[in-house]
């Protein structure tokens, strides 16, 4: 059983933006509600959803420091790190995983992987990681049309891999329109999602 109130108190020590805190709580509750539908442990889902943005308000230099410490543990492979170092914000999930180990003694690989990969996704990641990536994109407080479409796939169509694929389609399309860099993990993830969906 997860001690939800203590985890939320811990989250508030790291995040000061109330909208972001609300997003994390909403993601956690949404994941807990629908996890078992996709054969995912609901407690693991709650923790992943609640703490995925734990390091979002951390400075870039601290994100890099924490990320390097996490990589040294060799629990989860962090691909394209040299590239990501130029865009430290995308490593906030990796930094969050290191905080979770140090401060909360969370050492379950599946949870740590899901937090590491929630921003860009990745190739061949676990169902919990896939679910965290999707729910970060489509939790009920997300108020834009693509998120609502993915939400509907999760809630009404019961199709995890379709939701996963569409999350990438919307994410990559948005980056292309804005002429932003696409992290290679997202390309790997898209290809993996397409393969899973077409199985």
Predicted regions and their residues:
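Short, Lys/Arg-rich amphipathic segments at extreme N-termini
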Residues: 1-32, 189-192
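Divalent metal-dependent catalytic cores for phosphoryl transfer on phosphate-bearing substrates
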Residues: 7-15, 34-162
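Short, contiguous clusters of charged residues that form electrostatic/catalytic patches at enzyme active sites
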Residues: 25-29, 94, 98, 166
């Amino acid at each position: 059983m997860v001690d939800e109130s203590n985890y939320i108190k811990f989250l508030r020590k790291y995040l000061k933006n109330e909208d972001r805190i609300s997003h994390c709580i909403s993601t956690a509750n949404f994941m807990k509600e629908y996890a078992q539908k996709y054969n995912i442990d609901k407690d693991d889902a709650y923790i992943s959803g609640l703490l995925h943005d734990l390091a979002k308000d951390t400075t870039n230099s601290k994100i890099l420091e924490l990320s390097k410490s996490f990589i040294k543990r060799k629990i989860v492979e962090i691909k394209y790190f040299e590239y990501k170092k130029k865009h430290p914000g995308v490593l906030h999930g990796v930094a969050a995983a290191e905080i979770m180990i140090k401060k909360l003694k969370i050492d379950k690989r599946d949870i740590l992987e899901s937090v590491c990969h929630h921003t860009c996704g990745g190739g061949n990641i676990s169902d919990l990681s896939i679910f965290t990536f999707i729910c970060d994109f489509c939790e009920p407080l997300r108020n834009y049309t693509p998120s609502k479409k993915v939400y509907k796939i999760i809630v009404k169509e019961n199709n995890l891999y379709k939701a996963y694929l569409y999350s990438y389609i919307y994410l990559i399309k948005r980056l292309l329109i804005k002429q932003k860099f696409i992290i290679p993990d997202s390309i790997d993830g898209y290809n993996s999602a397409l393969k899973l969906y077409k199985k």
